[in-house]
Amino acid sequence: MPAYRSRTSTHGRNMSGARGLWRATGMTDADFGKPIIAIANSFTQFVPGHVHLKDLGQMVAREIEKAGGVAKEFDTIAIDDGIAMGHAGMLYSLPSRELIADSVEYMVNAHCADAMVCISNCDKITPGMLMASLRLNIPTIFISGGPMEAGKVTYQGETHAVDLIDAMIKGADQNVSDEEALAFEKESCPTCGSCSGMFTANSMNCLIEALGLGLPGNGTVVATHADRKELFLEAGRRIVDLARRAYEGDDASVLPRSIATFQAFENAMTLDIAMGGSTNTVLHLLAAAQEAGVAFGMSDIDRLSRRVPCLCKVAPNVPDVHIEDVHRAGGIMGILGQLDRGGLINRECGTIHARTLAEGLDRWDISRSNDPKVVEFYKAAPGGVRTTEAFSQSKRWAEVDKDRTAGVIRSVDNAFSKDGGLAVLFGNLALDGCIVKTAGVDDKNLTFSGPAVICESQDEAVAKILGGQVKSGDVVIVRYEGPRGGPGMQEMLYPTSYLKSMGLGKECALITDGRFSGGTSGLSIGHVSPEAAEGGAIGLIQAGDIIDIHIPNRSIAIRVSDAELEKRRQAMQALGPKAWKPVDRDRQVSAALRAYAAMTTSAARGAVRDVSQLER
């Protein structure tokens, strides 16, 4: 039987000083020997997805203590990508993922915690904590703060469910009055929680369910609903059981690396493709796989994207459908259930709530479960009241959405499209691949060719789009915004939103070595690898070059010869210190960001640290 890690600091006369300090935190003799459970919270008043988390860590702590454990809470940082968007703040978003992973590792290892509950929610916090949990490989349960309710706006005589992206598009549309734009702004984010569409935060919280590290409903019960409280309480009870199984029962099956196997990563990516999740999830799954020691890469994503259909479309891919509607249709277990029927997932993977995913689906998939409590659970509805309080309402739908023919979640036979919601493209423009969210691409744009409009930064792209320098049929190239070139791999939500507001959302393509918000839709191709700053061909494109995009064939190319590209490469190399750097870009980059850039890898590797640099 492996000893509890915490005994390193709680047992033996030589640890009397440490025990003295533990006693000062409230521990007693009776606590020395119990499992110490770290609660990694992420409360902050900066972020609506985290503003309601302040007291929830202590609520979980009390449940841990009732179950026989000792709970110790700490907080991580949390950046709001929406507030950081469109200015230099976005440079810090992706790098914060590594800081979060490191800080969780530091706290847990420094204090010898035995197990962990991760209370996360928004874009980089869930991935950062996921990376840490796989590094540490101690029993871990994830519980998210939950999605925001969608807003409601009456516009041009019709009432619509709206979200942050609608407000951004209307705010930039000169045909929308100030009063109308303000109405969208005020109603787009009506409650606490992560933004209400299938954006990055909600995508990641849904994928946690597929990986097996979260409870059913983790990704879909709205933050305001009383049912989410039970998820938090159950996480507190269950983590003590997992800790005892791991240490007292020598059961390694409950450890994160035993659960998040190659097959589990396949399940998570399969879900992502089926629900048209954010392209950022690709970065985060690749990064998490590396922490788990799992050889899951772009070729695997490409393979899965060719066989998994699109079973669920949610904003921003379609209007008026949000995460609250996915929950009513059976949530993530409902989507996984349909994928299981199609033979598209690995049903023998373990989870923290059931021995296998198959057993979990038998209980939680509303298409096969006879448990009235499960059906009642998926009736949890938005309350429709502006609030920043968690668990503040208990409204329920009259019935769940079991329609698998034309409902929010479809069967494989009635899929929205045979091809899934994400695709990996390769070609001379992206030798190591790039990502497009096909669920958000209009059918007419699945093949697209047009002349390149070169932008050496996101700011230049915004200026050219709003300044009328981008025309129908153009391909906007935004480069030197990758992990190293940005640095920080900014999201391009403003350029894509402004294309929509200018009436060009379905008339242009945008290609970048940066990334996109989960709120992006349209022909938006990101994560181009290698990036320009690493010598990628995106840095060799010239204004007017024809770019050919063929999503069905998974190809993307600059329409110039190999000889011409080599000629341009040699000319670039001849620039010496100025080679592979943006032209005339005025950007202040802090020492912290320069340190990130010096260590990061390409998007094709998840933009994780190049640890080989540490082996010198």
Curated annotation (Swiss-Prot):
Lineage: Bacteria, Pseudomonadati, Pseudomonadota, Alphaproteobacteria, Rhodospirillales
Biological pathway: Amino-acid biosynthesis; L-isoleucine biosynthesis; L-isoleucine from 2-oxobutanoate: step 3/4; Amino-acid biosynthesis; L-valine biosynthesis; L-valine from pyruvate: step 3/4
One cellular-component annotation, GO: cytosol
Oligomer and partners: Homodimer.
Record keywords, A-Z: 2Fe-2S, Amino-acid biosynthesis, Branched-chain amino acid biosynthesis, Iron, Iron-sulfur, Lyase, Magnesium, Metal-binding
Protein name (Swiss-Prot/TrEMBL): Dihydroxy-acid dehydratase
Binding residue positions for Mg(2+): D81, D123, K124, E491
Top-level lineage group: Bacteria
Homology family: Belongs to the IlvD/Edd family.
Gene that encodes it: ilvD
Cofactor: [2Fe-2S] cluster; Mg(2+)
Source organism (scientific name): Paramagnetospirillum magneticum (strain ATCC 700264 / AMB-1) (Magnetospirillum magneticum)
Gene Ontology terms for molecular function: 2 iron, 2 sulfur cluster binding; dihydroxy-acid dehydratase activity; magnesium ion binding
Example GO BP: isoleucine biosynthetic process
